[in-house]
C-alpha cells in the first residue's frame, strides 16, 4: 500500500454491469459495455477485460521505461501488449494475463531483465501477484 496517495481515479458503472455503461468522473472515459460474443453477448461495446488490458499494458510499459531509464537505456519504439483472458475458475471466474514485450534493437536478454524488474515494481503486477497468472513474453 502506498505511503501517500498521489492520484485517485474514479469510475461509475450504470445499467446492467457488463451490459451497461461506464464513465470516469473527468469524462475521459464514457463507454457502453457489452458482454463479448464469446461469452454469449452481443459484443457491441467494450468490456472490463479490454479496460483492464489497456490499463495493465500502459502501466507495465511505464514501469519498463522507468527500469530501463535507471540503467540509462532508451527503449525507442517499444511496445507492451496485454492479453487478458477470462474463464471459469471453480464456482467463479478468473483472469489470466500475458504481457508481450517488444523492444526493437535491444538484446532479448536485456529486455527480459528489464521486464522481470518492471514486473516487480509495476502497480498492476503488484496488485495481481498471487491472484492471477501473469506471463511475461519477450519478443
Residue ranges and their predicted role:
Residues 1-54, 61-139:
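Extended beta-strand/beta-hairpin segments
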Amino acid at each position: 500500500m502506498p505511503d501517500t496517495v498521489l492520484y485517485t481515479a474514479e469510475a461509475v458503472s450504470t445499467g446492467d454491469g457488463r451490459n451497461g455503461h461506464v464513465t470516469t468522473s473527468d469524462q475521459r472515459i464514457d463507454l457502453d459495455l457489452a458482454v463479448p460474443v464469446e461469452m454469449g453477448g452481443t459484443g457491441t461495446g467494450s468490456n472490463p477485460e479490454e479496460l483492464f488490458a489497456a490499463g495493465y499494458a500502459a502501466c507495465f510499459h511505464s514501469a519498463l521505461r522507468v527500469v530501463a531509464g535507471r540503467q540509462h537505456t532508451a527503449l525507442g519504439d517499444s511496445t507492451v501488449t496485454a492479453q487478458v483472458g477470462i474463464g471459469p475458475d471453480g464456482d467463479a471466474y478468473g483472469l489470466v494475463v500475458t504481457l508481450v514485450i517488444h523492444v526493437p534493437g535491444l538484446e532479448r536478454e536485456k529486455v527480459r531483465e528489464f521486464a522481470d524488474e518492471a514486473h516487480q515494481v509495476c502497480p498492476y503486477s503488484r496488485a495481481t501477484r498471487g491472484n492471477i497468472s501473469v506471463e511475461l513474453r519477450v519478443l
